[in-house]
Amino acid sequence: MQRSPLEKASVVSKLFFSWTRPILKKGYRQRLELSDIYHISSSDSADNLSEKLEREWDRELASKKNPKLINALRRCFFWRFMFYGIILYLGEVTKAVQPLLLGRIIASYDPDNKVERSIAIYLGIGLCLLFIVRTLLLHPAIFGLHHIGMQMRIAMFSLIYKKTLKLSSRVLDKISIGQLVSLLSNNLNKFDEGLALAHFVWIAPLQVTLLMGLLWELLQAFTFCGLAFLVVLAFLQAGLGKMMMKYRDQRAGKINERLVITSEIIENIQSVKAYCWEEAMEKIIENLRQTELKLTRKAAYVRYLNSSAFFFSGFFVVFLSVLPYALLKGIILRKIFTTISFCIVLRMAVTRQFPWAVQTWYDSLGAINKIQDFLQKQEYKTLEYNLTTTDVVMENVTAYWEEGFSKLFEKAKENNNNRKISNGDNNLFFSNLLLGAPVLKDISFKIERGQLMAVAGSTGAGKTSLLMMIMGELEPSEGKIKHSGRISFCSQYSWIMPGTIKDNIIFGVSYDEYRYRSVIKACQLEEDISKFAEKDNIVLGEGGITLSGGQRARISLARAVYKDADLYLLDSPFGYLDVLTEKEIFESCVCKLMANKTRILVTSKMEHLKQADKILILHEGSIYFYGTFSELQNQRPDFSSKLMGCDTFDQFTAERRNSIITETLRRFSLEGDTSVSWNETKKPSFKQTGEFGEKRKNSILNSINSKRKFSVAQKTSLQMNGIEETSDEPLERKLSLVPHSEPGEGILPRSNAVNSGPTFLGGRRQSVLNLMTCSSVNQGQSIHRKTATSTRKMSLAPQASLAEIDIYSRRLSQDTGLEISEEINEEDLRDCFFDDVENIPAVTTWNTYLRYITVHKSLMFVLIWCLVVFLAEVAASLVVLCLFPKILFQDKGNSTKSANNSYAVIITSTSSYYIFYIYVGVADTLLALGLFRGLPLVHTLITVSKTLHHKMLQSVLQAPMSTLNTLKTGGILNRFSKDIAVLDDLLPLTIFDFVQLLLIVIGAVVVVSVLQPYIFLATVPVIAAFILLRAYFLHTSQQLKQLESEGRSPIFTHLVTSLKGLWTLRAFGRQPYFETLFHKALNLHTANWFLYLSTLRWFQMRIEMIFVIFFIAVTFISILTTGEGEGRVGIILTLAMNIMGTLQWAVNSSIDVDSLMRSVSRVFKFIDMPTEDGKPNNSFRPSKDSQLSKVMIIENQHVKKDDIWPSGGQMTVKDLTAKYIDGGNAILENISFSISPGQRVGLLGRTGSGKSTLLLAFLRLLNTKGEIQIDGVSWDSITLQQWRKAFGVIPQKVFIFSGTFRKNLDPYGQWSDQEIWKVADEVGLRSVIEQFPGKLDFVLVDGGCVLSHGHKQLMCLARSVLSKAKILLLDEPSAHLDPITYQIIRRTLKQAFADCTVILSEHRIEAMLECQRFLVIEENKVRQYDSIQRMLSEKSLFRQAISPADRLKLLPQRNSSRQKSRSNIAALKEETEEEVQETKL
């Protein structure tokens, strides 16, 4: 950034905004970059403004019981606000004085008033000076008010952000991210844009009073006729506005539904393509779009009539004021023209300025009250710590996630008793809600310094809540907690802040090379970092999108380990790691590097429990066991079933198993929701073996019993707006649907329907607490890999054993939150936060306009029709101008003039001009009303928007993943939200206003030129100056606006990033650092916005200066050349005064049109994306039948094999190479292998080795080379749809879109209810679906928020069964599954896919044991592909990954594989207690 010229600018330069000339010149000649923008002044700095307002707000909180934020704002900004308001009032007063001088000039041409004729020239000079004074007063005042509004917004932005970092977790659980974004975008933008109008709430009444007094002198009591009409018109416009808002509110719901579905499709585009659902998704969105457009048209018609009413009101107010007076008393031309000028000013004050001012105050006060309520919410309370304490002690602690639960519990219980909803077991009813019970009950333990305590338990047992209570996030209601307070924390869901890898690990702590390298080595990050060209200085944006899930997890762990603390809280840090990496990190990092530190590790792995000093097992919030591992084996031999949350599944009967499935899944389904967190109450049930059978959990479905959603605090569903854990698309990409700018978006669009946050059916929004608990879900494999040669980097860490060193032996210097932030400049912020820079011209090209016009044939005809109507109106005006004087006043000498004439209108030789002016008013009214062209134009433009949306949707759905991988999800969503909103709402009426204003100006110029040809000579250079000035300004303004839009994205992205890592921020005490970073983002946006406001005011001032010159020329030409024509002078000057506002309005509208057309350019850019090649090749022929329709039928054993393809599922892969993006590095190279029909193949490899990539390559979702054949048919010889239908897919990223169960299972409607129920029963979903009202017709929203991750995996499994595919691809199907669902999936795979080829990528050892062959991927290549017995007999990755006990389990399979000629799936023996222990939860 550069130093601002404003600092050294003179008073004159500031007054005329001349200091912006350098940036305007540079923007016209070249493309502006962020470095070209000027630094802001200290008075606009977010630090200073926030400190100022925070000081006044604290003063307000301390001095009053009912603090008011508006009082704090008043003390900060009131006097400057009033100063500019007075200047604005003086500028508006000049408008009221101008008609007086106009009347005097007209009167000077009265033949009976020879005296004033001599001073006409001085009156003309006075009139011109009034315009000059108005220009010099108005623009600085408006700019000053915009500046104050900007400062108020900045101060409140900062205040809200600081408050957000202090909010308690209980409050965050009740606030949606959409509400926070809306608070920062929708509400606070009102200060920027509306503060200049706020003063008109008192200026407009004063101005109306002054004007009515002046009009009284001319028309006496008849003045109130015109005022009454304006008041009625104002109420009419208010009614039309209310009607328009009703349509918009109705449409907002439809827009929201469309955007929710669109967002889900974009986030899950890989799944959509894998399922071949493009056409089904397109049909769903187009149906919603059709309903939306009906309401859009209604709102546009009403808004069009409202806009037209303002234009034609000018004629009627003059007519109603002048006509009664003229009929009774007669009138002279001076009064007519003076009245016209007064009425124009009066119309603006009554119908525009005052209503807008009232609306501004209403919106602003509403926003202030919302912010005030937010600032008074409960804050996070830091626990009292004793720094000298070395142990961690918890004594009889009980805690609730929610306060005041008793009333809610009783109410819900009463409602539930009335409903008596069955859960599938006739002996049980959901009579208890998950309310009232504490999340932790009577917890006591003690950990000595240097000990490792492992915390285990079933899902929802309270493990994460225990850590939150130690950190102070969960306040205990009973008991005591003692520790030193020096805590380090690693979240279960890895959180990456914007910045480099090094910044993420150091995290504001002083840098120490020795410690840093040791941590890097212990966390197995050396090899990963060496692959990046920038090493650990690579900038990570959007939550670490360029990293795999395992890499993010290790960076989060390294951050926790690097900090020197007394207590380390590690919440399931190994969830995304492969078995070997997990084992190495646990031994080298947790056990050796941190050997002298106190550690609490949440885990369920038996190896971890064996090495822990203490073990704490939680069950339903209570301590099930506390002690050592040997004590655990002696005292609790049944502990493994408690870890699982169930007894041996196979021991139950089918009926009892189904009941357990229902109850367990229902328990997990509640964990996916995001409102208030409760633990579960239990009720005795039927008898069954084991302790688990003694009690069963009962619950009420959220969607049935209450509009308010209840959830437990420990979430395993990991849901954020319905998007599940993934290795494909990161969660942040959806959340950059912020106002981009945008969604997300970024992240969210600027339209009101989106900025408020997606509101799903039932009014449910995603809470901030849930956002925090799934901060890195969906962040899986990298899609933008910048890897160098994969040579392992030499370790810089000490070569001694990690057990022999102590990296914490010396205390580093005092941690500082400013150390890193001072090094972060604007370019770093751009790399971390900004969306990709749009590659579109600074000014909309003519090609874009031409292409837009030709999108729909009817638009061209409508534009031609508009031109024909205008030419007819101009021709009629010229005819009237020529014929009226001849027809009405053939005898000029017979005309007389007297003040006491009995005629209503004094007949003079100049009265013909008065009649002509009335006709011009009527013509302009017809032009404004536009009944024969306005409505068709608006209607057609909306139709064009419909066509563009349809084409863009088709283009996105048909685009290859290699193209979509280069785009950010928020950017794609912005096209369907913000840009389509522009095409629907703003562009049609803006084009209409511009065309209308342009024709009015042209008509007025023609009339004036005909009356006085010399004026035409002055008009030509003025119009040329306008065009040149517009072109000069437009290049810079559009670039500044784009930079401002880009600068808005970091603000909202940083807010979301901070919320997702809030627990980590508090644990590390990095709030000041993040506040500083937020202020830098605010300052960056302020620099762009302030410069845009300044250049805009420069342009507006030059426009008025050019007009002042034009008006001076018109005035003196009229006075010096008109002669005795009193009417001629009046009409020329009156039209000239009207041209000023209209022409300036037209120029501004043209700029708005150009700005809005940039949305059209972006839409065209998406429409022009390449498409996937779906054309069949003639080389493909079915073996038995040549009909292509039969090839499209994908069946399995239920249809004769002679009629279908594929028939067996044999796969042959030859030299397969795969890339994610064009020109990127190959993720897989020269992969070759073959799979026999019905064989089960397991994929092995470290995290990020390319296992998921191989599955995507099978589906042709990547840039691939080579060949794959299925049953002898090559993928190049059939269409993509045919190829992908050969596969059944269970992706790692589960896709549940907003719709019914039936639509989610069968979007094309191919299967009957009987078939769907059969499959649902087969996969264990029947009892779950039957719980919901409507059953298959129950509408799932928010990505299936009432379903657990296990439910959703079963939905995917049901889809695969329905597809009857012969090849099944499974990508981490057991990730984050509860044990019951995992058992169901395994059994369904054995039964429904017994004869199918199965390719499995899995981290669970027991799942991999069922495979006959294994494919080992390492360094982008196949390292080994062999049978189980060969893999176990050799030194291989598979042998290293499994324990000796697991190898023994494989003996039956090894023997059976030797005896069988075919590699069919071996029958699995029943689960044993030992297998259960190894299950990873």
Swiss-Prot record:
Keywords: ATP-binding, Cell membrane, Chloride, Chloride channel, Endoplasmic reticulum, Endosome, Glycoprotein, Ion channel, Ion transport, Isomerase, Isopeptide bond, Lipoprotein, Membrane, Nucleotide-binding, Nucleus, Palmitate, Phosphoprotein, Repeat, Transmembrane, Transmembrane helix, Transport, Ubl conjugation. Residues 1-77, 147-195, 244-298, 359-858, 940-990, 1035-1095, 1152-1481 are cytoplasmic. The modification Phosphothreonine is found at residue 716. Residues 653-831 are annotated as: Disordered R region. There is a cross-link at residue 687 (Glycyl lysine isopeptide (Lys-Gly) (interchain with G-Cter in ubiquitin)). SUPFAM superfamilies: ABC transporter transmembrane region, P-loop containing nucleoside triphosphate hydrolases. A lipid is attached at residues 523, 1396 (S-palmitoyl cysteine). GO terms for biological process: bicarbonate transport; cellular response to cAMP; cellular response to forskolin; chloride transmembrane transport; intracellular pH elevation; membrane hyperpolarization; multicellular organismal-level water homeostasis; response to endoplasmic reticulum stress. The modification Phosphoserine is found at residues 548, 659, 669, 685, 699, 711, 736, 767, 790, 795, 813, 1457. It is a multi-pass membrane protein. Disulfide bonds: none annotated. This is Cystic fibrosis transmembrane conductance regulator. Residues 1453-1464 have a biased composition (Low complexity). It comes from Muntiacus muntjak. N-glycosylated. Phosphorylated; cAMP treatment promotes phosphorylation and activates the channel. Dephosphorylation decreases the ATPase activity (in vitro). Phosphorylation at PKA sites activates the channel. Phosphorylation at PKC sites enhances the response to phosphorylation by PKA. Phosphorylated by AMPK; this inhibits channel activity. It catalyses: ATP + H2O + closed Cl(-) channel = ADP + phosphate + open Cl(-) channel; chloride(in) = chloride(out); hydrogencarbonate(in) = hydrogencarbonate(out); ATP + H2O = ADP + phosphate + H(+). Residues 1471-1481 have a biased composition (Acidic residues). The chain crosses the membrane at residues 78-98, 123-146, 196-216, 223-243, 299-319, 340-358, 859-879, 919-939, 991-1011, 1014-1034, 1096-1116, 1131-1151. ATP 1 binds at residues 401, 457-464, 492. Signal peptide: none annotated. Its EC number is 5.6.1.6. Residues 81-365, 859-1155 form the ABC transmembrane type-1 domain. Epithelial ion channel that plays an important role in the regulation of epithelial ion and water transport and fluid homeostasis. Mediates the transport of chloride ions across the cell membrane. Possesses an intrinsic ATPase activity and utilizes ATP to gate its channel; the passive flow of anions through the channel is gated by cycles of ATP binding and hydrolysis by the ATP-binding domains. The ion channel is also permeable to HCO(3)(-); selectivity depends on the extracellular chloride concentration. Residues 1387-1481 are annotated as: Interaction with GORASP2. Binds and hydrolyzes ATP via the two cytoplasmic ABC transporter nucleotide-binding domains. The two ATP-binding domains interact with each other, forming a head-to-tail dimer. Normal ATPase activity requires interaction between the two domains. The first ABC transporter nucleotide-binding domain has no ATPase activity by itself.
